[in-house]
Structure formats: C-alpha cells, structure tokens
Amino acid sequence: MAPGMSGRGGAALLCLSALLAHASGRSHPASPSPPGPQASPVLPVSYRLSHTRLAFFLREARPPSPAVANSSLQRSEPFVVFQTKELPVLNVSLGPFSTSQVVARELLQPSSTLDIPERLTVNWKVRAFIVRSHVPASQPVVQVLFYVAGRDWDDFGVTERLPCVRLHAFRDAREVKSSCRLSGGLATCLVRAELPLAWFGPPAPAAPPTARRKSPDGLEPEATGESQQAELYYTLHAPDASGGCGGSRRGAGPGVGARAESPTQHPLLRIGSISLFRPPPRRTLQEHRLDSNLMIRLPDRPLKPGEVLSILLYLAPNSSSPSSPSVEHFTLRVKAKKGVTLLGTKSRSGQWHVTSELLTGAKHSTATVDVAWAQSTPLPPREGQGPLEILQLDFEMENFTSQSVKRRIMWHIDYRGHGALPDLERAVTELTVIQRDVQAILPLAMDTEIINTAILTGRTVAIPVKVIAIEVNGLVLDISALVECESDNEDIIKVSSSCDYVFVSGKESRGSMNARVTFRYDVLNAPLEMTVWVPKLPLHIELSDARLSQVKGWRVPILPDRRSVRESEDEDEEEEERRQSASRGCTLQYQHATLQVFTQFHTTSSEGTDQVVTMLGPDWLVEVTDLVSDFMRVGDPRVAHMVDSSTLAGLEPGTTPFKVVSPLTEAVLGETLLTVTEEKVSITQLQAQVVASLALSLRPSPGSSHTILATTAAQQTLSFLKQEALLSLWLSYSDGTTAPLSLYSPRDYGLLVSSLDEHVATVTQDRAFPLVVAEAEGSGELLRAELTIAESCQKTKRKSVLATTPVGLRVHFGRDEEDPTYDYPGPSQPGPGGGEDEARGAGPPGSALPAPEAPGPGTASPVVPPTEDFLPLPTGFLQVPRGLTDLEIGMYALLGVFCLAILVFLINCIVFVLRYRHKRIPPEGQTSMDHSHHWVFLGNGQPLRVQGELSPPAGNPLETVPAFCHGDHHSSGSSQTSVQSQVHGRGDGSSGGSARDQAEDPASSPTSKRKRVKFTTFTTLPSEELAYDSVPAGEEDEEEEEDLGWGCPDVAGPTRPTAPPDLHNYMRRIKEIA
C-alpha cells in the first residue's frame, strides 16, 4: 500500500513516462482492454488491495455492461475477498496520485447469519455435526456439535463475543429446544436436547444377551424395528445480559400439537434428520461359555484403568448329561496377561467348596482354584434349570498410556479323573480397557474450502485440522495427537503425517466438492470432507497487441538488456560511439504490449461425475498474473523479451510462443503466440488529458453479491490556486492500436510540456515529471505536449519530434456542481516520416519555443528520466498552501543575486554605448584625433604612426584606420567627411565590411613576430545621416594585395585605382598586426 503522501498537496501533472512501469510493490496493474484495436484509451490507474489473506481481481467473461464500461477518464475493476481478518483497504494510484478507501463491512458480508458487533466475519460459516444419527429410547438425548469454520484459530480476541446457538428438534408439530454458546479456541459448543419418549416408536421384542453387535461406524447398535424421523434446525442469537443462552425448553408436552413458544425471529437453518427407535431390552451382562459345563458372565461395557472387574463362574444347564465329564470336582486354572491382576476368589454358594492359590509374576498372574461339590449326595441333573452360581473372581485393570488396550484372560479346566481338554479348546476372554468412554470423533478444519493456487505458484496451501472426541457424558476432548489419518485420493487432497493439517502441493490434477480424508481413533473413524478448487487449464493469456512492429523515427539507445543478439557489441565500444555520435548506438523502438493471465477455479460436483462447478460462476475470470509472474517464459528470447511482469517488447522480426510453465514439472500451463513483424508503424496521434484528482467509489457488482466493483473517476478541473495537475498520455499507432506512454521506459523518449498562457497555468519541474500549476481562472487549449526521441539519440543541433498535441485545461476556482469532461480528439502533429522532424528553433534538446499560434509567451519544461520513485503526495488530494523550504529560499536568493549582476552589467553596457555614440569627429584639417578608448591591443610592435592628416596622436597605442570619403562626395574637391570604422579581424584573415565598400590591402609588420588580433574601435559620426563602414583586413595573398579598390576616385587617380604609398604602408602594417 502506498504510504500517506506528504509535501505539496493536491494533484500533479502525470508524465506517464514514470508511471506504471516503475510502480512499486505488488501493486495490482489495471487490466487492459480485451485484445485487438482499441477505440479509445482507458484511464491507466493501478489498483492494490491490502489487509487481506486471499483476494482476487476479476474480469467479466462477457463484454462489460455500460454501467462498468471504461473510458479515458474512468476505470472500473471488480474484485472479491475470500479471507481477511480486518477490513481491506483498496488503493488506487496514478503516478504520484494515490487515494485509498476502506471496503465497508456491508460490501464484504451483505447477508451474514453470523453477526458479531464490531467484528468482521467474512467467510465465517457455522457448521453442525450430529453426534449420533440413531437415537435409542434408552438414551433419548440428541447431541449436535457446532463450530465456526473460516475463522482464524489464533484469533482469541473474539471468543468472548461469540453468539449462542439454539437447536430446534421437530417431530410432527412438536418442538424441543436447547441452546449453548460458542466458545474456546475452536469456537465450538455441544448442544444436548432430551427428547420425549412419545417421539419413539413401539418397543421391539427382546433379544438374547449375546455379544454386542456394533454398527459399521462403531458408534451405535443397529436399530431393529420401525424408526421415527425427527428434523433438526438451528438459529443464532445473542447471549443475554449475564452471558448465558438459556436452558433446554420443551413443547407443551408429549402428544400436544402446539408449540410452547412463539416462532423465533431468526431464520431457521436446517441441520439434518435423525432416526428414533426403541431397541430390544438388553441385559447389562454378557456371557461366555468356557466349555459345555461351565460359563462366565461379565459386564457388557468397556473398562477403565484401575477399575475392578468381577467375573462370575456358573454351572451351565444340562451339564450332567452322560457324555459330559463329572463336574463335582474340577480344577480351574486362570492366567491373566500383563495389565490385568487377579485379586482373589470367593465362593458364591455353600454347596461348593473352593480353595485357591495365587501367583503373581512380572508378565502375568495365575490362579489355581480347586472346586468340589460340598454335599454328600451326588449332583442332581440340571435339565430345564437355570445356571448355578459357583464362585466369583476379581480382576483389577492396570494403568496404561495409550487411549485403549485389549487385555486377555485364559481359562483352563481340569476335571478330576478325566484327561485335560485339548489346548485348542481352552477358552480366552478378551477385555477392552479405555482411557475415556468416547462415543464419537469429529475432525474439524479451520476452513471448509481450499483454493489450489499451488498449481500456479508451487507453494503449498494448507488448512489446519483438529480432531475432537465426544464422551458419553458430553465432555469434548482434543485428540488430534492420538489419531491416524489417510487421504482417500491424494490426486485431490493430501494430509500430513501428523494428521494436523490437510494440504495441496501443486501436483494435484483435479478438484472435488467432497474431497475426503479419513481419521481413525481406536475402533472409531470419521471422515473430513473438503471442497477443493483447481485452476482451469490451459490458462487464458491476453496480450494487448499480439503483433509488434518498429515505430518509424523513434530511435532509442541500445542498452545491454535490450540489444538484439545479432547486434551485440562490446559495451565499452558502444559507450564510446554514443559519445561520438548521437545517431550511432541507437535503434528503432519496437512496440510494447501489456499481458494478463486469467483462469477460472472449478471443481467436480461429486466423485465419479463430470459435472463441473465454477467458483463465482461461469461469468467471471480470475486474474492470476501476479501468481505466475515468476514462471512466464518467452520461447525465443531473440524475438521478444519481458520488460517486467506485465509488459512485453519486441527485439527483432519473428514469431515466438509466450507461455506460462508449471513451477514443479515445467509443463506448459498456458500459451499464446507473439509476432514481431518487419513492418513499421508510425505514431498517428498523441492523446493527452489533464488529471487533477482521483475519486474512488465502491459498490456491489451488478448481479453478484460476492464481488465488489471499484470505480475510479478522474477530475479535470483545477479548483484552487496553486493546485497541481498531471497528464495522462496515450499513443495511437497507424495499425489501429493504442498504448499508454507508461509502457515505455522514460530513458527512451523526451517529453516537453509547454504552457501557452502563463497567466492561467505554469509548468514546473519540481519532481521527476512536469507539473501544471493553476495561477488564474481560464480554459481552453492552454498546454502543449511534445514527444521527442531520447536525448542520447538526437542528431547534432536537431530535435527529432515524434508527436505534438494541444491539451485542454480548465481552471475554475470554487467547486462546480459537476466536473465537466473535456475531450480533445484533435490529431496531434507528428513530424513527417514517422516524426523525425526538426523543431522550430536551433536550441538544444530540452528547450522549447512558443508555438506560432500561441496567444502569449510560452514556457516549456522537459521531462527527464526519473532516477527515483515518485515523491509522495497527500492521500485524498487535500491541497494546502505550502511555505518555502530552506533550500528553496537559498536558491531564490542566489537567483536574485545573479539577476542583479546581469542587470548591472547590461546597464553599464548601455551607458557605455550611449556615451560614445554621440561623440563627433573633429573638423577637417585637424592633424590628429585622440581615441579615448581601445578595446583590444595585442602586438609586439610599437604604436603605429601614419604620415599626414591620418596620423593619430602620439599617446594612442593603436592607430586609427584612414577615413573614407562619403558615398555622395563631389569631384570638385569639397571637403570629405571622415568616419571612424569598426575593423573586425578574424582568424582566417577575412573580415566583414560594408555592403557597398570593401577593400583589401597588404600590411607589413615592423617587428620580427606576427600576431593576429581582434579589435574594435568606436567613434562618433559627424551627422546622423552617416553610417558605420567596415575596413577589411587584407589577405596574405600577394595578388589580392595589389588589387585594392577604393571608394574615392580622386585618391587613386582617374585611370587606375591605386592606393597612395603612405596609406598602402599603413594597411600593410595593420595586416601584419592582424
């Protein structure tokens, strides 16, 4: 999330040259329009969600409705939030602009049944488990466990504010209610409701006391006879003032048709149905036959550690038959295995004489019991009589560490006078000893769904699991560390070896609505069912332009990361060439394309069926570009390359596949073709729009209660003084495609923004991009944007312009009822031949001249490539006047000193020129003229002297040039007016002179050394009608020295224009000095 922006408030001018391509962090780039030519540009904002655990941006599979259509000033983006602990924050940014909005709770959970005040319950679901689906009349209690799925188990702060759950059991028109409150780290509670006996059917016939038969799930004996059905529902309600939920309540009584309470105000949510039955009467003891004469009886229930077990020995009926051995005297040998201790024996009847001997060993204990008939009469026949009780044996169950164990007791009978029974006929009694009397186990997952993004990222997605046990007395225990587990299909879902979480690793190939993992505890087992969503393959890859071409006239520097394989050169040589010539080391720019990857998460409805269920419905595509960004590949890196995770650029002509590969197996998850053509396109239009601020709004997406639609609108009007604005820039190509300027690196171009009316708005360069600053109210095409090639590729003294465009601007102080939208579709002005046009001036790159049609002076500010990220601006565009910083004060003071120095220099020059301009030349006949100043004197000779009237005073260090006669002189010898001229000596020996009078004369130096000199001498004119003339310095060529021409014919004579000797010598000396 972008931090809160500070500094100069308000909006700023967007140089999209430094926008989305350099945006930070896992911001979510705005999705481009569907592939193909775009009719108009789209506001290139970037969305980013924070404070979420699992969320996706979406796109409609069908064309968007007009309500969500995008334009150059509006951008809509749907998204969905699956998992979050707090309210998400949506940030939208455009260059330096950024605004955020908290997603309202009503948008995240529009119809949540689990409502907790001041608590976010997104994706929370109340799950209900029926402990026993068959309820016997002997235990007429229905038990239902409730827990909250989708909640973070580490979130302990909410446990004190969880609601109550009320169970409603209905049988015909009768109802029974019972409540409990969700609590604890797992947010669970167990509801127990006692059912009336009238709800159960008639009793079933009695069954013999045989060994207990268990149902397949090991929870309950199978019901026999006809069962009755009862329906279970639940409601949620807030606890009372004391924090309780109220006890169980029953209807008006058995058989009464009306309910005792008014219907609840909360919606009834169905749980399921249970079966009610009357089991046959069952004895509490189970019988085991030791042989045909003797039997034992023991309790029909599991045993607990430390419990004393009493086993009774009986003489079975029909035991005195002729085939049976005599039972009047026998010896019973008992061996108890480790974990069972034989405490003692005692006679249960005076008719039997019992003596015993006990031996306790390290591994087992044994007892030898001698039993004899105590009466003098023989044992009477037992036909038709019940069992005869003989003796009682007491055993103690020892402690153990496991949850349940099996203990064995071996029985051996030796009849006196008869051989022992074969070993195979020896009886063995097996006892079950348990730590707790568990009637059911239930696996609970923190969430009921898994979105298998591991297929795309290679990162495991895991869901924690807890297994709880429910005892007969209603106690709930955590037995997660004591269970065993196994996945029914590891191609869908897996489970950890410690059974503490289920996961997907990315190697799965399908999903399921009821993926099952089985957990086992002792003889009990229970399944955990999950919904697993997998991405639909192949992935859908969208390119904004699948055919990339070179752009005419757009030259960019050849950099190592862009250079084609065929053009690779030594980097040092390239840098040297770039310094030598701006046209070398550059190549034509290739078009760029944005890319996005979409998919749909789906699953199968049930095992063995092909019915496909799509998450969020078939109308939505989920964007997964960020998830697969590390696994994108360009098939041929010589043809194209990836600028970043969302941009492709061409390198050389060819066709290459662009694909997304699996992070685990390198299999191709999605693929599309990219073509780089040899054809060239030109920039037909540069489109620019002013963006003064951004407005973000959130609302439910039409037709879907789960998705949210974010809409960003750009405001164009600058509404207060010194407000800053930015530009949104788009390029239109001759092939019909458009692209934001932000797709291209700022080092590949230059952007010049000029203000055509500085009274209304100015352009400044405070940051890494130009900003438009409001100065006064006004509207119209007050700005001008000019796109040029990179400075390193500019030709000498030329500026190659790619495109120009006027930009509409409106400054109105005060808030309008609605912000008018300006659209300036007028074509830009690209240079001929793809924009390689020279600018209207010879200034260096980066300077700008006002457009000829501009109504006032224009200023320009070139865009330089930014070297750092955008500086922060205030979130929400709260703009306030700012004071000058210390740095700015120092810079302004330094600028003022420079301006003052320049002003003083100019005033001095003007005074100097005006002072000597009005001096007059002395009258004719004066023998000397004093030159009051000489700008330059360089030479090795002595001051020159010229004979006659042309000689200067002795005090002058440099002689003056001879005066020419005026152009309208008379042959009668009227007085000639001398003018002092400017003599400009140049390094090549040439000099500029008057258009009418130019002459050359050789000059000789009176010294042995020669130097060339530039000097200028000013003097005054005798009248305002006279103009300055130039006296040229002679060439070194001897032939030219002999052909000097003069403007006064009476000086050289009527026949041949030759120079007087004195003047000839004078000119030669000047030549030598020059």
Swiss-Prot record:
GO terms for biological process: posterior lateral line neuromast hair cell development. The chain crosses the membrane at residues 894-914. It is a single-pass type I membrane protein. Glycans are attached at N70, N91, N318, N399. It is found in: Membrane. Belongs to the TMEM132 family. It is linked to TMEM132E is located in a region involved in a heterozygous deletion of approximately 4.7 Mb; this deletion, involving the NF1 gene and contiguous genes lying in its flanking regions, is observed in a patient with 17q11.2 microdeletion syndrome, a syndrome characterized by variable facial dysmorphism, intellectual disability, developmental delay, and an excessive number of neurofibromas. This is Transmembrane protein 132E. It comes from Homo sapiens (Human). The gene is TMEM132E.
